[in-house]
Amino acid sequence: MAGFRKENDEVWLDVYIQPKASRDQIQGWHGEELKIAITAPPVDGQANAHLIKFLAKQFKVAKSQIVIHKGELGRHKTVRITSPQQLPAILDQSAD
C-alpha cells in the first residue's frame, strides 16, 4: 500500500483526518491514505495533538516518537512513527 512505508525502524503513514468524529478510530483506506477519525476539533492544533495521542496508543510508542512531517494545517498528513512496538491490524495485513 503506497500510503504505508517501513524504513529501518520507522513507519511512514499518509493519513486523511476526519476531525469532530463521534469516536476515535482507524476507518480504513481512503484511496492511498489511511483514514482516521478523531473526536477533536480542527482548532488551535487540537486535532494534531489528539491524532498524535491516538497514534501513540495504536503503535504503543511515546508521543515524542510521532512527528507530523507534512500537512499540519490540512486533513492530508504524512506522519513518521519511530520504533513502533506494534502495528494496527489494518497495517499488519498491508505489510504482508
From Swiss-Prot:
Native organism taxonomy: Bacteria, Pseudomonadati, Pseudomonadota, Gammaproteobacteria, Aeromonadales
Which family, according to UniProt? Answer: Belongs to the UPF0235 family.
In terms of superkingdom, the source organism counts as Bacteria
Which Gene Ontology terms of cellular component type are present?
cytoplasm
**NCBIfam families this protein is in?**
DUF167 family protein, PRK05090.1
- What name is this protein filed under? UPF0235 protein Tola_0962
Originating organism? Tolumonas auensis (strain DSM 9187 / NBRC 110442 / TA 4)
